[in-house]
């Protein structure tokens, strides 16, 4: 209704979280009969309108004079796409006014100590995942269970990435009140128990090289990863901890697209990813 400036949405079935979905940036309202190139010319409803876009370097925006929710504070906004290693430096050099998602604990500590900057850290709903391929070399239950028991997630979160993560046991983050505190990890960290599991299953180091064997060959696992929010740091920590168990881990680092394709194809032993799990605030999105 143009006069009343209202929109009526008719659904095929009830959807309690519809309003949250409409506010989630992943969802876009479009005319289905239109012809769009959203990858290069996105259409939004926010306070700024896109004027130029380069997926590798920068997005330039201007004030949206039709914005529905009051005065827009800035006439122009430039968003630079920086690597994780360059964000803090760009801020310190005065090249940018604001940065988000600094994932280096050392960079954050440096900025905290500098009175020229305000550092804000909050709990989010993003989770880091490690996936185990239950086919191939890791098809044996005992081997998979031992791997999980051999990993000290608490130390990885507190030391490896400087406390930027919280140890997780669910796809739902601890920052939400969805009963997370009642969950129990069935594979609590216990190196001795993990080693006994492998010994009892017959996976032993018979030649003294520090690596256990399966069918006469060293157990070597391929771990695929990509550089995002310290995933590579976790991969290296897992590699180190599993070596103590007697398992060799080969890390194969690549871009996110290649890793995703290999994961879908099942061409990995271990892999990781990093996702916002409840973007609209409703856990049913991920269940």
Task: Give short role names for the model-derived ranges.
Residues 36, 64-109, 248-250:
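Ligand-site clamp/hinge motif
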